[in-house]
Swiss-Prot record:
Any Gene Ontology biological process: rRNA methylation
Top-level taxon of origin: Eukaryota
Subunit annotation: Interacts with mitochondrial RNA polymerase POLRMT. Interacts with TFAM.
Top-level class of the enzyme under EC nomenclature: transferase
Gene3D superfamilies for this protein: Ribosomal RNA adenine dimethylase-like, domain 2, Vaccinia Virus protein VP39
Official protein name in the record: Dimethyladenosine transferase 1, mitochondrial
């Protein structure tokens, strides 16, 4: 569990409240960007405390919006705060915070999904992967629309040790829809167990810190929000390429209500599906009647290890996509029907 940090000695001078900032700059949450503002500084302070000590830490905040969490971070005795904001409407309010904290806040107008953070912080804070985490922390109240693709992107970055993880095992404290937060931490056998559970837990220690009621946000979302802490593991629990693990996990969970052999079969071309699926399950020592939600990380490790060997034996296997095979069969069927019609059959 992340140790609770204390807010530091540096304090921002008196400033307009977040609500006043919103009114001053005529800000409205953009529905198409799934924006929701957290105005209660007691809650933003709690997020920062739960992140652990941020003293002398370089913080990367994603989606700062009007600057609620930004203020709490600036009061946490940090080394520097880098914020990346896509919506230009928020830049003037963030600039006001930057002026109030000289040398502490750096603002980038950009998209967090494409922003390159590898050179944003000093090289001397980098740590070896096996060492303690670096003095870098990612914090963010993520827009619902980007939270899942963003965490998947960062999980792949962890596996490759690039992006924000070029500095080492960078910690993350992030908000998600409560349902997504529950999936991230879901244990074997729970109904929330999903693709996201496996992808996060094979690479990180994941903890659901606390839940923020939806009514705390403006505008009020239809769901509550979970605050989640992720710490990259020194050694992943599945030592295979990220794309391979992702393919196996995706195929299994696309038929989450079926027995696991149903989804695993989609890893193989139809002509060899029955035989290859049986071989995969036998070599991995997996009961074919287990449901996807009842497969443990060790089960997935075995499946990925065996599938990797099968891909090594057949170099074309990994590129196989059962949906493409279905499309080709459909096209051939349509062509056959067309030929029949042209001959008057």
């Amino acid at each position: 569990m992340a140790a609770s940090g204390k807010l530091g000695t540096f304090r921002l001078p008196p400033l307009p409240t977040i609500r006043e900032i919103i009114k001053l700059f005529g800000l409205r949450a953009a529905k198409q960007l799934s924006q929701n503002f957290l105005l209660d500084l007691r809650l933003t302070d709690k997020i920062v405390r739960k992140a652990g000590s941020l003293a002398d830490v370089y913080v990367y905040e994603v989606g700062p919006g009007p600057g609620g969490i930004t203020r709490s971070i600036l009061n946490a005795d940090i080394a520097e705060l880098l914020v990346v904001e896509k919506d230009t409407r928020f830049i003037p309010g963030l600039q006001m915070l930057s002026d109030a904290a000289p040398g502490k806040l750096r603002i980038v107008h950009g998209d967090v999904l494409t922003y390159k953070i590898e050179k944003a912080f000093p090289d001397n804070i980098r740590r070896q992967w096996e060492d303690d985490p670096p003095n870098v922390h990612i914090i963010g109240n993520l827009p619902f629309s980007v939270s899942t693709p963003l965490i998947i992107k960062w999980l792949e970055n962890i596996s490759l040790k690039n992006g924000p993880f070029v500095y080492g095992r960078t910690k993350m404290t992030l908000t998600f829809q409560k349902e997504v937060a529950e999936r991230l931490v879901a244990t074997t056998g729970s109904k929330q167990r999903s693709r996201l559970s496996i992808m996060a837990q094979y690479l990180c220690n994941v903890e659901h810190l606390f839940t923020i009621p939806g009514k705390a946000f403006v505008p009020k979302p239809e769901v509550d929000v979970g605050v989640v802490h992720l710490m990259p593991l020194v050694q992943p629990k599945i030592k295979q390429p990220f794309k391979l693990v992702e393919k196996v996990v995706q195929n299994v969970f696309q038929f989450r209500r079926k027995y696991c052999h149903r989804g695993l079969g989609m890893l193989f071309p139809e002509a060899q599906r029955l035989e290859s699926t049986g071989r995969l399950l036998q070599l991995a020592d997996i009961d074919p009647t287990l449901r996807p939600t009842h497969l443990s990380l060790m089960h997935f490790k075995s499946l990925c290890d065996v599938y990797r060997k099968m891909c090594d034996e057949d170099p074309q296997l990994f590129a196989y996509n059962f949906r493409e095979e279905l499309k080709q069969k459909k096209r051939k069927g349509q062509e056959k029907d067309g030929d029949s019609e042209s001959w008057g059959f």
